A protein has these predicted regions:
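FIC/Doc superfamily catalytic core
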Residues: 1-203
Length: 203
């Protein structure tokens, strides 16, 4: 016990920003799921020093930078305890897709994934995969999702850590199943999951 007290008093643990490195790990793994080959060390250099890794594409670098900015925004928002809205989710998606999003012109109209616009076309899970919700049903589904999540946040027992984690996982699952955007759904819904965890004091 004396050794532990002396260790804490020394301030050694304050020399490392564990929260920053945890956040960089979340970002690196989330973009890796989407095909990024940038490592945690490379992201640290990119985020902190502006040094890009040799052999990594501009798209990969921008994907990681955008997600970092979205995480900073989302974690700050989580402290304000505001209700989830469609506009907030669109803002998250816009930040995630800021430099890698694209404008689309389809039968349903024009939309821009870099602006967080909800998709106006139908999408499937890969070529020949299962189709997601029809695009015409997406706006109501996202609004209903926000209503559900707000109700859950209000009533959950924050001392029940397992229940809080389950809620964050279910929020991710429900939103990614709706697949509101044409691209960036995985990154945005994982970010939402982490925002819920932040809001509930888990991370």
């Amino acid at each position: 016990l004396d050794v532990l007290e002396r260790y804490i008093a020394s301030g050694i643990e304050q020399q490392v920003d564990y929260e920053k490195f945890y956040l960089y790990s979340l970002i690196t793994h989330s973009t890796a799921i989407e095909g990024s080959t940038i490592t945690e060390v490379e992201n640290q250099l990119l985020f902190d020093e502006g040094i890009v890794a040799k052999g990594r594409s501009i798209n990969e670098q921008m994907m990681n930078v955008d997600l970092k900015n979205a995480y900073f925004y989302g974690f700050e928002w989580a402290q304000k305890m505001q209700p989830y809205t469609v506009d907030f989710l669109r803002q998250l998606s816009a930040m995630v897709m800021r430099r890698t999003g694209t404008k689309y012109s389809v039968i349903g109209g024009e939309f821009d994934s870099a602006q967080g616009d909800l998709r106006l076309c139908n999408v499937s899970a890969g070529v020949g995969g299962s189709s997601y919700l029809a695009f015409a049903k997406v706006p109501k589904a996202v609004a209903d999702f926000c209503e559900w999540l707000n109700a859950q946040i209000q009533t959950i027992n924050r001392n029940d850590v397992a229940a809080c984690y389950r809620l964050s996982f279910e929020a991710h699952f429900r939103l990614v199943t709706i697949h509101p955007w044409v691209d960036g759904n995985g990154r945005t819904t994982r970010l939402l999951m982490n925002i819920v965890q932040r809001q509930l004091g888990l991370i």
